[in-house]
């Protein structure tokens, strides 16, 4: 016997109860146990940082990462779900710096690297319990106990193996290169880390500087927006084909050279200068000039202080002449190509000038701009100063400006494997698909060598030891190898430990480790190997778990984790590291801004779960554009709407079934016979079997959007058609076969639907299943196999018939709404127009249902719209504009004059001739836009090939019937308000008025049947609620149980 179900459910409390049921009965563990030995489905979980609490942005991928493994487990696969933690890197160090009140490399070194790393280890997992509680409360099944941490020695050792494998393949090299650099963190960043940060609009000083040509009183006017780079100037760049002008500035009495196109930008009055000559930039090549600062004069003999050709120079901004210092990627390339200058970098780790630039020593580069400008102005090198508004990158961790500077770093040679990267990308199933060729594919096409070293402390040390005497390098790939080389026992691989490990070289030097640590993205990219301690353990099973069948993360990971996984997969095995990926977009606040505690622009996620339930939140996220890698403007109201429009209707269907099943003592038979006689039963069973096919197909393709859409469509069909149209079958007093078939069908539909929904909304489905399951059923809904379609029960003919009836009903309801005709008000006639003979035949079969649904007395089927409307036409300018040209206006006037019968001919495929002068034009249906004018009292609507019309004239008889239906609805509402049981018989009390008397005279029996009223009594003392039957018709009613 089923338990009684409350109409109003507290879903968060139900979810807490289900969590306890899962924990007490170890359901997750059982779901894993029963699939042991089955085909393995590999899922990689991208490791988050545990330095902050999870937010809505984490909830999206965590929901996706729950749905797919649940589904695959129900499909009979063995799916390991081990949680991972990203424990190294800048995010952790930055948190510790804030905690300790220290900042920068020097202060950390003074504090002590060992002490600093101890603090990192303490803080790194401070939120793990909160993460565990929140993720489990979201309904995600994942094993936290067997999870991995990137700081574990086994994980770190496998990362060393990955590094050495790349090193041995010639894919690792050390070099100076201009890299994005975080001054606050005192370390270079990779290009994709820069993209993780924010580009802000900034106002930088824009300077035009005079560079004096050697042995001449002539000056090159060079432009820059980075004054701080001027002390390191080593060259000047011009465009080879750009035209330059040598002018005499009458006011300054100086000879100046700048791009000809830029003269108007610098001089308002062309009489203020005289053009001496014009020439191409190639004429300036090799010209020497006098340096504006004397800090690096020794570089002159190595080719510094000359003019070079550069294809990146334009006249869009500035003067068409650009100063060169080794702080820009293009500048650095030009200097390397044309000179032998040394690497000039007069900055310390925090981007403050060193004593190489004594006048500005100790100043942060951006702060030095002002003093440098003053210096240049004082010495008459400053020609012009302006402000330049442009977008500039800021560090994604410190929100501090990024500085580009030449720095020694270790790189992965991505250029060398770029062709293979693009090749393996073709084998990945991206969801959404456009990312393959779009965002990810384009990123691979433009991929640069990856800077993987960080001048930091809490990370996996780069395992290279260098001989102090010869520079010989040894790359270490394991703990055992390091022990063998050093003769020391290794217990920990962190920097503060391994930096102490040295050993003598045969050449009389000492092997000392290079000081850098690995970019933490290298570690996360190595996760498939390191989380399994490959190749030191699990080597034989590795081929079964690589590449992953599935991963999921946010859009930003196209330049992060997805990218590093692919680089290392290709480098190691010439393979992608994953076969299928679902990419989600950003979750923003309702105002479109980034969610921020400081902005107070979002609700605490746990408050949302405790208010609406995790199921509602999961469904809201999965239904949204965020699952298609688009942004979502999060709204609490959106979650509330999902609860109201989806979760509660599911509950109502379940409540409806159990309520009547308890009354009639219905018990499902052991073997349900699903071959039914009633068309409604046949239809909903067929729709359910078709749904199974769709879901198995779409989830297998990782198309969650299509899957959810199909589930929601079925829920609507079940609630708003099957149950609503079957109500009277459950209300019958006698338990005949039809009533029993209705019970069996609805039981099967709800129970099966719950199993189909279980991966998406695991709580409510478990709650409902627990009440519906029989003794033969599995202990938990999540221990079931995912349902597969029974093709024998799919009846496409009946699906088409009823779905056509539903379409007509929907159109008629829209038409009523458009013209303010209430659904309870009967109409005398509906006309349905379709030329399709098959549709006409189906409409005849569905006539009784359609008339009942739309509350109409009669239905007529037509083949031609003109029985309901007259046509007018307008010119379709989009089509005609291409072929009419100057005659367009004349023809459009003629089209507007077309008669109804002419337009009908055009609709029927007969072209219509219009003559303009001696030219004839022939109109087809594509050339005109139809306008419909309704006949008489008809109201008409058209959708694709179907047109319907309703007679809007309401007679008095129809009007009274409509009032009766509204009267019944109000009585039913009062029954609900007073918590009467659906089977309770009542006495109905009413006031005596003329309108009610008319209603009773005609519809008393109908009212009693619908409301279970045994008696209708005029009794003023029992009246309790005023009701509105129509705009100006009110009455008072009361009810009591008999």
Curated annotation (Swiss-Prot):
Q: State the Gene Ontology BP annotations.
A: isoleucyl-tRNA aminoacylation
Q: Which cofactor does it need?
A: Zn(2+)
**Transmembrane ranges?**
none
* Molecular function (Gene Ontology), one example: isoleucine-tRNA ligase activity
| Alphabetical keyword list | Aminoacyl-tRNA synthetase, ATP-binding, Cytoplasm, Ligase, Metal-binding, Nucleotide-binding, Protein biosynthesis, Zinc
Q: Which family does it belong to?
A: Belongs to the class-I aminoacyl-tRNA synthetase family. IleS type 2 subfamily.
Q: What is known of its domains?
A: IleRS has two distinct active sites: one for aminoacylation and one for editing. The misactivated valine is translocated from the active site to the editing site, which sterically excludes the correctly activated isoleucine. The single editing site contains two valyl binding pockets, one specific for each substrate (Val-AMP or Val-tRNA(Ile)).
Question: What is the annotated quaternary arrangement, including any partners?
Answer: Monomer.
HAMAP family from the UniProt entry: Ile_tRNA_synth_type2 (MF_02003)
- What is the name listed in the Swiss-Prot or TrEMBL entry for this protein? Isoleucine--tRNA ligase
**Organism the protein comes from:** Borreliella afzelii (strain PKo) (Borrelia afzelii)
Could you tell me the gene encoding this protein?
ileS
